[in-house]
């Protein structure tokens, strides 16, 4: 519990957190904090891709996106996919670094116990970057993560569970009535 409270405090201070999941490490920052998102973008060498937005519950979706009933259904699937949805105009509480050149956000809900607990403490939108599409260097343990993310990550939230394999999130986008 203490580690979760400290991790939440790190995020509230506008810093970068690495969370160890069964699928690898995930970089996390508050979605409203521009400075850590700029640091993450500089680290990744990527300036245009949307950064995935994790929301605490389905009720929060409408505050940030214009989402269809079908997209809402997809985002609530057990596999916790990313769903590309149109940004709601006036979503001022998000940093412009979330989708600097686009009109869409990749949104998701917590897909693991660690993120459910973290979101329960914060109840704030999070920017979450995993190794989806090989956007992040791969680290299979804490020692490697410290080396790979040196100078970027301010705190690591880890568990004693091993990283089993790198499993990228599924990205779903509605095109007409179809899911792609």
Q: Residues of each region from the PLM?
A:
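Active-site-adjacent structural elements in enzyme catalytic cores
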Residues: 1-180
């Amino acid at each position: 519990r203490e580690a979760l409270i400290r991790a939440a405090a790190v995020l509230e201070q506008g810093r970068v957190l690495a969370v160890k999941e069964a699928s690898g490490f995930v970089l996390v920052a508050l979605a409203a904090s521009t400075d850590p998102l700029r640091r993450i973008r500089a680290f990744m060498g990527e300036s245009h891709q949307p950064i995935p937005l994790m929301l605490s519950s389905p009720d929060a979706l409408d505050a940030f996106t214009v989402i269809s009933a079908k997209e809402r259904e997809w985002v609530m699937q057990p596999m916790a996919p990313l769903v590309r949805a149109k940004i709601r105009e006036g979503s001022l509480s998000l940093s412009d670094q979330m989708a600097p050149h686009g009109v869409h956000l990749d949104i998701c809900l917590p897909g693991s116990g660690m993120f459910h607990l973290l979101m329960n403490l914060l109840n704030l939108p999070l920017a979450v970057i995993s190794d989806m599409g090989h956007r992040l260097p791969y680290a299979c343990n804490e020692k490697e993560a410290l080396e790979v993310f040196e100078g970027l990550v301010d705190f690591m939230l880890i568990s004693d569970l091993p990283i089993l394999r790198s499993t990228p999130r599924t990205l779903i986008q509605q095109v007409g009535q179809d899911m792609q």
